A protein has these predicted regions:
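Short "lid" loop at the C-terminus of a central beta-strand within the Rossmann-like core
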Residues: 113, 139-145, 181
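Short alpha-helix
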Residues: 156-176
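Conserved beta-strand signature within the Rossmann-like core of class I S-adenosyl-L-methionine
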Residues: 132-140
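Conserved class I S-adenosyl-L-methionine
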Residues: 1-32, 143
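A short acidic, Gly/Pro-enriched loop at the edge of an enzyme's catalytic core
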Residues: 97-105
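Class I SAM-dependent methyltransferase SAM/SAH-binding core
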Residues: 38, 44-95
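A short, conserved alpha-helix within the catalytic core of class I
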Residues: 113-125
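Core SAM-dependent methyltransferase catalytic element
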Residues: 184-208
Length: 208
């Protein structure tokens, strides 16, 4: 789907995604000391707004202008004036250099791209994070197609933990966590299967 497709999807519903943060984002980001965060392909901003509520200063980026407008609208209903100053919503392509650098956290939550585009996106994310900062990748796993629920139905854009690790091979990161996890989905008889990978930037060198 291109930006216009997502514009149409976001324009046609009150909320495409839930208003609360992803369960894995909440679990893994809650222990982190708030700093500067970049939410890549932020959608309607559910994770970005939650991060702001936890004390982070967040850039929420999406290539859909309608999604970016949704982020601003949702933030206005959830955040006070001081918190709103810590949220910037921008139109940006995940496969291009990130909007800004030296982030303490770069988040990829259910960003599914063909492999070449994914490699560009994750390399840009690693380059944008400060030494000691984290890159968190959450997405639908390959097994979700046959054993899970929801998510894209195209195996070419789904990532298992080992696929994420292969995509960052040679980049200056250390692996803190790489797991396949089951996520309960309300109203569904079986869980969704998610890939969850947490990386830490290890050296001050450009991503390659």
């Amino acid at each position: 789907m291109d930006a216009s497709d997502w514009d149409e999807r976001y324009a046609g519903a009150d909320l495409v995604w839930s208003a609360g943060p992803n369960v894995w984002v909440r679990e893994l980001c809650s222990p982190l000391t708030p700093g500067r965060a970049l939410d890549v392909a932020a959608g309607e901003g559910r994770n970005a707004i939650w991060l702001v509520e936890q004390g982070w200063t967040v850039t929420a980026a999406d290539f859909s202008p309608v999604a970016v407008s949704r982020i601003r609208d949702l933030a206005a209903t959830r955040l006070d004036e001081d918190a709103l100053r810590r949220l910037e919503a921008v139109v940006a392509d995940a496969t291009q250099p990130a909007p800004g650098t030296a982030y303490d956290l770069v988040l990829f939550s259910y960003l599914h791209l063909v492999r070449e585009e994914w490699h560009r996106a994750v390399a840009a994310g690693v380059e944008a994070v400060a030494v000691g900062g984290r890159v968190l990748v959450v997405g639908h796993a390959q097994g979700n197609l046959t054993e899970g629920v929801g998510g894209p139905q195209d195996a070419a854009i789904l990532l298992d933990p080992e696929d994420v690790l292969a995509s960052v091979a040679g980049l200056p990161v250390a692996v803190e966590l790489a797991q396949l996890r089951a996520r309960d989905v309300e109203g569904e008889p079986r869980p969704a299967l998610d890939t969850v990978v947490l990386l830490r930037r290890t050296e001050d060198a450009p991503a390659r």
